Amino acid sequence: MTTTRHRLLATASRFVTTLESLDVDAMLAVRSPTCLHHMCLPSFRNYSITNDQTREAFPQWKATITKYQFGILDDSQTLVDEQARKVMIRAKTAAETTVGDYNNEYVFILRMTEDCDTVDEIWEFYDSLRLRDLHHRLEGGHVPIGVDAPAPFTTTGSNSLDRSK
């Protein structure tokens, strides 16, 4: 018999695997149709995006990446709250982009659906200095970013989507 904890961890593992795959269909398949992805970085910009917005932004993001690795930084720091259906993971990325290397660390909090099979909400926290450096290099390389660019390349403005529970 599979426990709630095992189902939550299996879904979190699929989330990580799909991020590394750079396959937008696989990335969205592990999410519920109403999943919101919150970028939580007060010193840079907070915003939330839907699955449709993720799909729209993905080609631009993927076009800047030539090699990509994403994974759990430390399994011992993974936390599971079975009652809230949440998993917190600490992750890292190492990428080669069209404007040089990009490395970052992340904390993801994933809230799963009631059956624990898909991710219903994502809170993503990351090192803003490293992201800002990448944005400056992209701007220098004339990659369109800013208010009119699709997320995750938007740098100003706000999004009022809120699914606080």
UniProtKB/Swiss-Prot annotation:
Coiled coil: none
Disulfide bonds: none
Gene Ontology biological process: terpenoid biosynthetic process
Gene3D superfamilies: 3.10.450.50
Database matches in InterPro entries: Fungal_Meroterpenoid_Isomerase
Signal sequence annotation: none
Metabolic or biological pathway, per its Swiss-Prot or TrEMBL entry: Secondary metabolite biosynthesis; terpenoid biosynthesis
Subunit comment: Homodimer.
Similarity field: Belongs to the trt14 isomerase family.
Function: Part of the gene cluster that mediates the biosynthesis of calidodehydroaustin, a fungal meroterpenoid. The first step of the pathway is the synthesis of 3,5-dimethylorsellinic acid by the polyketide synthase ausA. 3,5-dimethylorsellinic acid is then prenylated by the polyprenyl transferase ausN. Further epoxidation by the FAD-dependent monooxygenase ausM and cyclization by the probable terpene cyclase ausL lead to the formation of protoaustinoid A.
Other known facts: In A.calidoustus, the austinoid gene cluster lies on a contiguous DNA region, while clusters from E.nidulans and P.brasilianum are split in their respective genomes. Genetic rearrangements provoked variability among the clusters and E.nidulans produces the least number of austionoid derivatives with the end products austinol and dehydroaustinol, while P.brasilianum can produce until acetoxydehydroaustin, and A.calidoustus produces the highest number of identified derivatives.
Record's protein name: Austinoid biosynthesis cluster protein J
Gene source species: Aspergillus calidoustus
